[in-house]
């Protein structure tokens, strides 16, 4: 007798071993039709898998997160089925699930085109309409090898070679004549795969190594139903409209080019935006007791060996040589700040000592990981380091937390999640030190009265960190600020202070950043605001435009007055119709356009229009200036 315990605590008895689907059928035809897979004693299995012992069972449907993941994984196999029907000579590689979708890597003698993608998507739809069952067969390893040899699937054979010899049987999933190996589970029938869409094609390399052969990667997305798919497509379209690369080009903010991969060319308007953020953060430094410093871009590798970066981070560093000495271009600012601290003696009465730097760093990110200004090789951080005693950790972290929240809210971010990244496998120091560091962060957040999520294994090699994850206007989450507790690096680099007993001790070092990479933060700001920055932040706050040449001198005077007041303003004196000027500057998302005609010139006034098209009417220049000040500009 087999006893199956369901999530509500009820039990069902079966005389013989029973499949997940058979249990679902015993509950009801509707549930059986909706069944995708099962979780037996917490382990995901196929609907066809047989339970031969007393167990707990949760039926997985498309309403479950796991169900949607299974749908996506099965859609990847469906890509394989369609591709092999259309292009029999290609070689299938691997097709995993990723966030909100899936991809399949394929070796093809020629690159796939958009027309190919459309044909593949069409064939997938035709296969789904056939409403066929997906059949799972556990198959001996030797037989699997013979199956893929007969089909010429060289990459599948390589993947089998990589598997442990302990694996002597594999799940083979049959989509009619097409077969793929997988741990599973997969959907029992193609009717679950109707809400899918192929999204793009890109290049990839076998095993992610650029020295290996290039593959074609087909990306797609799949959901529980058409409604979810349509909502996703709408969200992606909105994200494309907000893409910082697109807006950066439209508004002439920056550009990137092949000769400098991962490095940004800032144009005047983009640099104006940068300066607004930098000066704002500089004020935060000053108000929080940070002394701003500036440290060298390159340092001898001996320092990076002492700091631990050489052993733990050198693959991400750039190096250069001069006069038979090897130098590293700094990937982080912390070792430099310790050198500043080490100049002179410090008493416990001097602590905490806080240094801040808009430090330019370089990291050798893989070219495939680069993405606009969100993922770059050269970047500037609002980097700060606090040298303090153990007893001061909680108060410093608490103060930073309150400060970070205030900054995020000022930039328009109200939904903030807090996480603690805990010790990684590759790390400095012993467990007792890590226990102390992680405990200090938990205590500080408890004192702040906030909830947090913990991320095992995601801390830096020298210490755990608090992470601030911000939700943007379309619901995407971005990781920005960090606060890290470091008991390691001060000792490795000889940082000391004299305690109340006249003994030399190593300070605790707190690594903190609020916006993190300036480049990345600006990219996020562009997308969050869709280029429509609040007046205080906009690279150009006001454009003053004349209707005819008769107002040119007055326009120049208004522009000069606003510039002298510290506003970012430009004039448009071109011989164009005013309607054309209004449209152009509205598309540039300039917050305010001042239109000057004869009436405004005679009355010493300005006619004010907003980028949304609202006509605020005529007002004195002083009244307009007061309006800007009221908006924080």
UniProtKB/Swiss-Prot annotation:
GO MF term list: ATP binding; metal ion binding; threonine-tRNA ligase activity; tRNA binding
Renumbered residue ranges of the record's region Catalytic: 243-534
Keyword Phosphoprotein appears in the UniProt entry: no
Cofactor binding description: Binds 1 zinc ion per subunit.
Group of enzyme by EC: ligase
Swiss-Prot/TrEMBL catalytic activity: tRNA(Thr) + L-threonine + ATP = L-threonyl-tRNA(Thr) + AMP + diphosphate + H(+)
Biological process (GO), any one: threonyl-tRNA aminoacylation
Pfam families registered for this protein in UniProt: HGTP_anticodon, TGS, tRNA-synt_2b, tRNA_SAD
Binding-site residues, Zn(2+): 334, 385, 511
Record carries keyword Zinc: yes
Main location: cytoplasm
EC numbers for this chain: 6.1.1.3
Keywords associated with the record: Aminoacyl-tRNA synthetase, ATP-binding, Cytoplasm, Ligase, Metal-binding, Nucleotide-binding, Protein biosynthesis, RNA-binding, tRNA-binding, Zinc
Residue stretches making up the TGS domain: 1-61
Record's subcellular location: Cytoplasm
Described purpose of this protein according to its UniProt entry: Catalyzes the attachment of threonine to tRNA(Thr) in a two-step reaction: L-threonine is first activated by ATP to form Thr-AMP and then transferred to the acceptor end of tRNA(Thr). Also edits incorrectly charged L-seryl-tRNA(Thr).
Quaternary structure (record): Homodimer.
Descriptive protein name: Threonine--tRNA ligase
Origin organism lineage: Bacteria, Pseudomonadati, Pseudomonadota, Gammaproteobacteria, Lysobacterales
């Amino acid at each position: 007798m087999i006893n199956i315990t369901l999530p509500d605590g009820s039990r069902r008895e079966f005389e013989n071993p029973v499949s997940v689907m058979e249990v679902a059928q015993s509950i009801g035809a509707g549930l059986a039709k909706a069944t995708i897979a099962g979780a037996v004693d917490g382990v995901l299995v196929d609907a066809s898998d047989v339970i031969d012992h007393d167990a707990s069972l949760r039926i997985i449907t498309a309403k479950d997160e796991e169900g949607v993941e299974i749908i996506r994984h099965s859609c990847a196999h469906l890509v394989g089925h369609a591709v092999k029907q259309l292009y029999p000579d290609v070689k299938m590689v691997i097709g995993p699930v990723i966030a909100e979708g899936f991809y399949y890597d394929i070796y093809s003698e020629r690159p796939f085109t958009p027309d190919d993608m459309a044909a593949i998507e069409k064939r997938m739809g035709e296969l789904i309409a056939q409403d066929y069952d997906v059949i799972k067969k556990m198959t001996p390893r030797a037989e699997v090898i013979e199956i893929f040899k007969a089909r010429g699937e060289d990459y599948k054979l390589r993947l089998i070679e990589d598997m442990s010899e302990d694996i002597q049987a594999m799940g083979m999933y049959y989509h009619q004549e097409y077969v793929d190996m997988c741990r599973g589970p997969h959907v029992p029938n193609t009717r679950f795969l109707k809400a899918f869409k192929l999204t793009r094609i890109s290049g990839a390399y076998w095993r992610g190594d650029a020295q290996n052969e290039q593959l074609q990667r087909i990306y797609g997305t799949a959901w529980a139903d058409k409604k979810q798919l349509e909502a996703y497509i709408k969200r992606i379209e909105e994200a494309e409209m907000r893409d910082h690369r697109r807006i950066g080009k439209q508004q002439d903010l920056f550009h990137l080019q092949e000769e400098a991969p991962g490095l940004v060319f800032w144009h005047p308007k983009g640099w104006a935006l940068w300066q607004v953020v930098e000066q704002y953060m500089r004020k935060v430094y000053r108000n929080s007791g940070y002394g701003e410093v500036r440290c060298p871009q390159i340092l001898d590798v001996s320092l990076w060996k002492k700091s631990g970066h050489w052993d733990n981070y050198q693959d991400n560093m750039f190096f250069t040589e001069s006069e038979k000495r090897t130098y590293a271009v700094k990937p982080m600012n912390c070792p430099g700040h310790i050198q500043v601290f080490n100049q002179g003696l410090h008493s416990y009465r001097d602590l905490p000592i806080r240094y801040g730097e808009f430090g330019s760093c370089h990291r050798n990110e893989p070219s495939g990981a680069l993405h606009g200004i969100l993922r770059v090789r050269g970047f500037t951080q609002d980097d700060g380091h606090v040298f303090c005693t153990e007893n001061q950790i909680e108060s410093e972290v608490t103060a930073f937390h309150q400060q970070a929240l205030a900054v995020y809210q000022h930039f328009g971010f109200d939904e903030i999640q807090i996480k603690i990244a805990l010790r990684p496998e590759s790390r400095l120091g012993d467990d007792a030190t890590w226990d102390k560091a992680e405990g200090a962060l938990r205590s500080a957040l408890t004192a702040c009265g906030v909830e947090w999520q913990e991320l095992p294994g995601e801390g830096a090699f020298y210490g755990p960190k608090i992470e601030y994850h911000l939700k943007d206007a379309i619901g995407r989450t971005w990781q920005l600020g960090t606060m890290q507790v470091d008991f390691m690096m001060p000792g490795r680099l000889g940082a000391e202070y004299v305690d109340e007993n006249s003994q030399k001790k190593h300070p605790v070092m707190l690594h903190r950043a609020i916006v993190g990479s300036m480049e990345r933060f600006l990219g996020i700001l562009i997308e969050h605001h869709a280029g429509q920055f609040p007046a205080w932040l906009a690279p150009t706050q006001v454009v003053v435009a004349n209707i005819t040449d008769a107002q040119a001198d007055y326009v120049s005077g208004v522009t000069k007055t606003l510039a002298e007041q510290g506003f970012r303003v430009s004039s448009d004196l071109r011989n164009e119709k005013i309607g054309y000027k209004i449209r152009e500057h509205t598309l540039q998302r300039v917050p305010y356009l001042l239109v000057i005609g004869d009436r405004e010139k005679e009355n010493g006034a300005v006619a004010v229009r907003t980028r949304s098209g609202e006509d605020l009417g005529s007002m004195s220049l002083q009244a307009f200036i007061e309006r800007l000040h009221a908006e924080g500009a």
